[in-house]
Amino acid sequence: MAGHSKWANIKHRKERQDAKKGKIFTKWIRELTVAARQGGGDPGSNPRLRLALDKALGANMTRDTIDRAVARGVGASDGDDVEELGYEGYGPGGVAIMVETMTDNRNRTAAAVRHAFTKCGGNLGTDGSVAYLFDRKGQISFAAGVDEDALIEAAMEADADDVVTNDDGSIDVFTSFSGFYAVRNALEAAGFKASDAEIVMLPTTSAVLDLETAEKVLKLIDMLEDLDDVQNVYSNAEIPDDVMEQLG
C-alpha cells in the first residue's frame, strides 16, 4: 500500500512542460469537445465531461472557452469531426510506448507520429504490439498532508484497487477503469479533495533506463507530446531518481 511511484518523475516532468508550452488548453478543449459529443453536454449525466470540466477549470480556462468547446461537441456550432486514435510502438532500449491522439485528419497524425518514432530511433508498431503491456486504470492523486489512514480506509471501502504513498508524501489511489468515477465520487463525498484524477495506462512491467537511453527515450516522448494532435503518451520506462537528476 506504500511505495514509490516509478513513473511519477516522468509525469511531473511532462506536466511542467505542458504548462510551459501552453498545450494544456488545447488538450482540454479537445477533450471537452469529444466528451460532449459522445455523452452529451450535461456534466451531471456525463462523467467524462465532468472530469474534463474539472481539469479545464483547474487549468484556469475561462468559462466562455469551456462553453464553446462543449457546444461544438454537441453540435451547437460547426466544427471539424474529431476522432480518437491510438498508436503503439517501441522506443530506444525496447521501451514500450502508447500514444493517444485526437485528430480531424488521421493521415496527418499517423505520418507525424511515425516520423517521431523513426527520427528518435524507435519503431511504430501495429495495433496490439505493446498494448498488452499496459492496463487501463483510474488514478486519483492527493497532495502531501492528507490523512493517510483515513484515505486508505475510505479508498478500500469504495473498492479501490490500491493506494500508493509516494516519497514526497503525496498519495495515489488506483482503481479499475470501470470503477474510476464511483471511487472518485465516493472519496469526494467522504471529504477528500483530489489534486488530480484521470484515466491512465499503467505498465505491467518496466524497463529501467541508464542515462544515455533515458535521454533518447525522453527525446522521443517530448517530440510526440509536442505534436498538436497528441493528448497523452505512456511508456514503461523507469528512470531512477539519480538518472533523472542528471537529466535536469
UniProtKB/Swiss-Prot annotation:
Top-level taxonomic group: Bacteria
Alphabetized Pfam families for the sequence: TACO1_YebC_N (PF20772), Transcrip_reg (PF01709)
The keyword Transcription regulation is assigned to this record: yes
Key words, A-Z: Cytoplasm, DNA-binding, Transcription, Transcription regulation
One cellular component term from this protein's GO annotations in UniProt: cytosol
InterPro entries reported for this sequence: Integrase-like_N (IPR017856), TACO1_YebC-like_2nd/3rd_dom (IPR048300), TACO1_YebC_N (IPR049083), Transcrip_reg_TACO1-like (IPR002876), Transcrip_reg_TACO1-like_dom3 (IPR026564), YebC-like (IPR029072)
A molecular-function term among this protein's GO annotations: DNA binding
Subcellular location as annotated: Cytoplasm
Gene Ontology terms: biological process: regulation of DNA-templated transcription
Family: Belongs to the TACO1 family.
NCBIfam families: PRK00110.1, PRK12378.1, YebC/PmpR family DNA-binding transcriptional regulator
Alphabetized HAMAP family for the sequence: Transcrip_reg_TACO1
Name of this protein: Probable transcriptional regulatory protein PSPPH_3775
Organism encoding this protein: Pseudomonas savastanoi pv. phaseolicola (strain 1448A / Race 6) (Pseudomonas syringae pv. phaseolicola (strain 1448A / Race 6))
